[in-house]
Amino acid sequence: MKKTFTLADANRTLPLVSRIVRDLVARYPAWRELVEEYELLTSSQRADAPDPRVEQLERQVTAVAREIDGYIHEVTELGAEAQSPLDSGLVDFPGVHDGRSIFLCWRLGEESIEHWHERDGGFAGRQSIGALEFADR
């Protein structure tokens, strides 16, 4: 069963979540650059003349991807969900309000959780937390 957060619980996890997401956001551009370089190199590579850099790039892409997966796993282990694109710094915390499932929505750089959205609403459906009444504020 998935963990659900009260607003206070989610806010208490933010110092740790923030550190993890900061690391994730910092590594993501390096991974994208490596993937783009790999794709460029392999698209122009001839079968009869393999480029020795391809194998090295594959190892680098894999290593950085594992690092990023580790950060995502850490966020997931806490009960939250890192959102795509990964460099957005968005994290959703499953919650319940008035008997319905919602997400408490946080973005890297925000000091506390100030937004929420319906489960199917996504970032575009973000609304101010002030619009909801939470007993645990």
Question: Where are these predicted regions, by residue range?
Answer:
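A short, surface-exposed helix-loop junction/capping segment
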Residues: 45-57
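Residue-level signal for alpha-helical context at structural boundaries
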Residues: 27-29, 35, 49, 86-89, ...
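Alpha-helix boundary/capping detector
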Residues: 36-37, 43, 50, 101, ...
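Long, hydrophobic N-terminal alpha-helical segment
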Residues: 1-44
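Short secondary-structure junctions and interdomain/linker hinges
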Residues: 31, 45, 78-82
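Amphipathic alpha-helical coiled-coil segments
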Residues: 17-34, 57, 61-64, 68-71, ...
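Glycine-rich, aromatic-bearing surface loops/beta-hairpins
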Residues: 69-137
